[in-house]
Amino acid sequence: MRDFPSCFGESGVQIADASSSSSSAGKGAAQNLVTCLYQTQFSGRACVISVTWSKSLMGQGLSIGVDDLSGQCLCKADIKPWLFSKKKGSKSLDVEDGKIEIFWDLSGAKFGAGPEPVEGFYVAVVFDLELVLLLGDMKKDAYRKTGANRSMLNAAFVARREHIYGKKVYSAKAQFCDKGQFHDIVIECDTIGLKDPCLEIRVDKKPVMQVKRLAWKFRGNHTILVDGLPVEVFWDVHSWLFGSTASNAVFMFHTCQAPEKSLPWSYSQIFRESQLQGLGFSLILHAWKLE
């Protein structure tokens, strides 16, 4: 990870990593990614399930992994774009205290503009014949295929990271609390040819924050309210202003029960560690400028 040095002291924010630097712009821009993290427990052992959907010129891809809190991979299944014809399958692995199984069926999946399927699929993770995570709308097919008990279906959605694209307007959808409503997020920022660019963020068409004098405030954080919950918004647009035209800015929306606490914010820490300690849900957006 490479963090930009903060220019806001203790209240500053560091949310950029190597994937958001201009040096890796080509790699990030060439592929559209969405990664979701789910926290769960296997026999009292806290684990993280990661589901990554990708879309490139070669086609769709899917990666599912199960890690423990130390970062050790317990089980992983990869469906590469050039192997996506294998749209149905499973993978299992015996671990120290049980057996992890991953099932998927994408044979009838329908995709929209993004890398995630919108319907006609399922992805399931099973531990010792207990269904832990189930994604998709084909639930009956998943129940029949896995033959698993549903009592452990308790994985908590803790983080989402995605890549979004635009010229000056960038859009995404987000759900900030479990079973809460989806919200439309719009980030607007025009940095080309302007002496004093401005950043504005809207939620459900309502302006919730505006940053002027962006050349001096290219990194920062601000608290907004969504669904009555405090959501801390972090931004890093340094690469838009001072990097290459192909680089991306990073935005993070983080819910926290105790937002007044001063936390050592780091993009990788938030995405991978802090939510596992009960510090809320995180949405990380990599916003790429299109020419």
Say what each PLM segment does.
Residues 2-15, 80-199, 223, 229-291:
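Peripheral membrane interaction modules
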Residues 6-90:
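Short Lys/Arg-enriched alpha/beta "domain-start" segment
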Residues 204-205, 227-228:
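Short strand-turn-strand beta-turns centered on an Asx-Gly dipeptide
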Residues 213:
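Extracellular glycan-recognition regions
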Residues 216:
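Short, contiguous, pocket-lining structural segments
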